[in-house]
Amino acid sequence: MQPDTSTDFLIIGAGFAGLVVAERLAAAGWRCVVADRRQHMGGNAYDEVDRAGVLVHRYGPHYFRTNSPRIVEYLSRFTGWREVAYTIKSFARGRFWSFPVNLNTFEELIGKPAATADFENWLAQAREPHETPRNSEEVIVSQVGRELYRLFFEGYTLKQWRRHPRELDASVCGRIPVRTNRDDHYLTESFQALPDRGYTAMFGRLLESSPGIDLRLGMDFAEARARFRHRHLVFTGAVDEYFGYRLGALPYRSLRFEAESFAGAALAERVGISGKPGFWQPAMQVNYPDPEVPFTRIVEIKHATGQQVDATTIVREFPADWQPGGEPFYPIPAPDARAAYQAYAALAEAERDVSFIGRLATYRYYNMDQVVGMALAEAERLVETYGKGGG
C-alpha cells in the first residue's frame, strides 16, 4: 500500500499514552494521526453504559490515583472528578474478609476482638525472616506469615499469573499494604478519584479540545504505517509485535470478562449480603483466592461511580493464557520475561524517529498516572527536539 496522505506524528494506540502525547503535540501545533485497532478510544480504560443502564469498565476496573498535582491539573482540563475511597474484600473459607490485611482481618481470623498490640505480637511470631526478599512469596511471608499468605495471596497469584509467587518479582505482591490498625482502604495515594462522567467522556473532551488530532479507529499498526507518511512514530502497543516477533513472542497474561446485571427482586435478595440496597456485593471489588474458583475477582464498579440507577452490573474476571493475535493485558513480572524483553529493548533503542511508551511498549506494569507522566515527558522531549509545528 502506498501512503496516501501525510502527518507530522503517527501515534499507535488511543489509550492514555497515545492520546496524552497527541494532545500535547497538537497543542504545540503539530498534526497527529492516532490509530487504534479497536473500534473505540480509551484503550483498556474504556468505559460505557451497558444494556442495564450501568456505567461499566469494559476491561477491568481502573482505579485512578496519584500523588502528582501536575497530573491531576493536566487531566482536570478534560474532566471533573468524583473522589473515591476504593474498598476491597476477599472471599475465602465461605466468608468475606477485610482486605488488605488489617486488624479487622486478624479479628476475623481468630474469632474474637483484639488490639493492635495483639496483632503485632501475632505477626512477630508468624513472619518468616527475609531481609531482602527475592520473590513475591518471600515478600508476603516476611510481612504476614504463612497462614495469611496461603489464605489470601498464594492461590490468587497462581491464578492471576499461572506462576507460583516464588517465580515472580518481589514487586508483584509488594504493592499490597499490610496494616495493624483498622484502615481497610486499598490505596494510599493522596488523590483517589474517577472522572465524574467516565474515562470515555474525558477522552472525548480531550479530542474536542485538539482539532489537530485525526483519530482512526479500527486501523491496525501495519495499515496505519503504510497509509500515513510521518516524521515521527509514537508506538504504545506491544514491543514484540512492533518488530514482528523477530526474537519470539514475549510472555503476557490475558483476561476474559463475564458481565451479569441484576435489578428488581434479584437485586433486592442480595441486600443481606451487600449490606445496602441496590448492590450485589459488599465492596467494589471482591477477590477470590481459592484456586478452585476459576475467576480472580468480581468487580461492581457502581460502588465507585456513585451512579444512581435501579440496577447493577458485576464483572467476573478470568485470567487467560495469551497467544499472538490475542489481547495482551499484563507483561509477566519475572526474571526470565524481563531478560527476554531486554533483547527487544536493544532493538527499540536503535530505531530512528520512533518513541516507545506505555505498559506494552516498555514491557512493564504502570499505573494510569505513571503512563500519563511518561506521555507528558515524552511529548515535552519531542517538542524540544522538533520545536513548534506550523498548525
Regions found by a protein language model. Name each.
Residues 93-232, 236, 243:
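Active-site/ligand-binding neighborhood in enzyme catalytic cores
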Residues 231, 241-389:
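C-terminal segments that line or cap access tunnels to active or ligand-binding sites in enzymes
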Residues 7-34:
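N-terminal Rossmann-like FAD-binding beta1-loop-alpha1 element of flavoenzymes
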Residues 52-126:
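Dinucleotide-binding Rossmann-like beta1-alpha1 core, especially the glycine-rich loop
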Residues 13, 85, 215-219:
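Short loop/edge segments at beta-strand edges and connector loops
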Residues 14, 237-238:
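Glycine-rich, N-terminal phosphate-binding loop of Rossmann-like dinucleotide-binding domains
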